[in-house]
């Protein structure tokens, strides 16, 4: 079954993976804005929530109501599970819980790795060595001067290594130079768990008429820490979801017609062609099960 959180609601729909029809609903009995779901056992999962809580649910019938509402100091959006632990990134650091002891009193914090308004939409990722990765913006005063990918050892609950992609300070950048970050960045990892993908703003051209930019996908090799340009995303300034398919194609969630609550899934192929799929509601996430 698929478990889908509904934005600005107090419920989770249980979806049949073949018919895509709802086969059940988990309805909250108190305030909540469910966001992301991670399994902690064959029968239970934890749901992140904007209401500064984690919610434990049943993933087998009878689904019923949530099993537990767990208050935490700060809200968490994206979660990952490694080594019977849950990691969740907040503005105050990464929270760490044991899956058999999820409580405000039992939380540990990795304080040096934290998100901000424009990185809170980045998924935490797990590589082939079962290490946890997170993206942060590096600042000098009010200026973002680099994008840092931080690797966390889940056993030690400490930063193992980090790699930074600097943002150009050139007065006259050249085409292809990284010149900025984007609003609400996103991350993904390839099926081999070797490459981490994220988004930047690059210089498209620098002429007498001025500098033009384009949103671009960069990727980093988890073994070498080397960064490389992957694909440009012309026509995109901000997105609601981002994923790279097993074939290496980029899929974005875009929303243009706010009044009618309609949006698009955009597929950027490696040959430069683009496919667009109009969908019925605001799309916010793309997954490849």
Walk through the language-model features, giving the residues of each.
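Short coil/turn segments that connect the beta-strands within blades of beta-propeller domains
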Residues: 1, 42-43, 83-84, 129-130, ...
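Residue position within the beta-strands of beta-propeller blades
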Residues: 4-5, 47, 88, 134, ...
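Intrinsically disordered, low-complexity segments enriched in Gly and acidic/Ser/Thr residues
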Residues: 163-261
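Blade-loop segments of beta-propeller domains
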Residues: 21-42
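A short beta-strand motif characteristic of beta-propeller blades
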Residues: 21-28, 63-70, 104-114, 158-177, ...
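Repeated scaffold domains used in trafficking and secretory/extracellular systems
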Residues: 32-39, 74-83, 116-127, 177-188, ...
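Structural motif
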Residues: 10-14, 53-57, 93-98, 141-150, ...
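Short loop/turn segments that connect beta-strands within beta-propeller blades
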Residues: 16-20, 59-63, 98-103, 153-157, ...
